[in-house]
Amino acid sequence: MATLVAPTTLDGLLGRVRALEPLIREHASRAERERRLAQPVSDALRDAGFFRIFRPASRGDGLELDPVTAFRVFEELSRIDSVVGWNVTLANACEVFGAWYSDHVTEEVFGSPKTVMAGSWNPPRKAVPADGGFRISGRTVFSSNCRSATWILGLANVFDDDKRCVSMTAERR
């Protein structure tokens, strides 16, 4: 399937959702059984742009949708299959954090239209300064869509001299 970037009107986006409905329904029981999106569905969602809903248009491939339009799309995907709606919504929630990335990290993470995010916020990991960066420790118990993701986003509490601040980390999968 070719990558689509237009149209980004609500009607156009809902048309894309409807076009994927037969494929999503065909693989719904498999997704439920395997507890993950079927690869053909994940690929079709990616190619249709549904993992780039909140990505900035300045990236060249981002849809940069407003929240009302985005959630209407999430709702329609969820109507077809809640597993699909959940995974697409959470993947896009991870993209929101890209607004705070440095230019270098933004280019590395979002430099490809095939980027798919997954993330886990709970429980947060612990990060302490180390040579060249941070040493992160902790355990992630759950992350929706991680098997389809090309990048994993995780929350880490940064500790330095008894002070704590919140930071996000991304890791290529």
Question: Language-model features: where?
Answer:
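Basic/polar N-terminal segments that are highly enriched at the extreme N-terminus
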Residues: 1-15
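General structural feature for long, well-ordered alpha-helical segments within catalytic domains
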Residues: 13-16, 20, 37, 41, ...
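N-terminal capping segment at the start of a domain
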Residues: 20-28
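Glycine-rich flavin
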Residues: 39-47, 51-149, 160-167
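Glycine-rich anion/phosphate-binding loop at the beta-strand->alpha-helix junction
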Residues: 155
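Conserved, charge-rich beta-strand/loop surface module that forms ligand/interface-binding patches
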Residues: 169-173
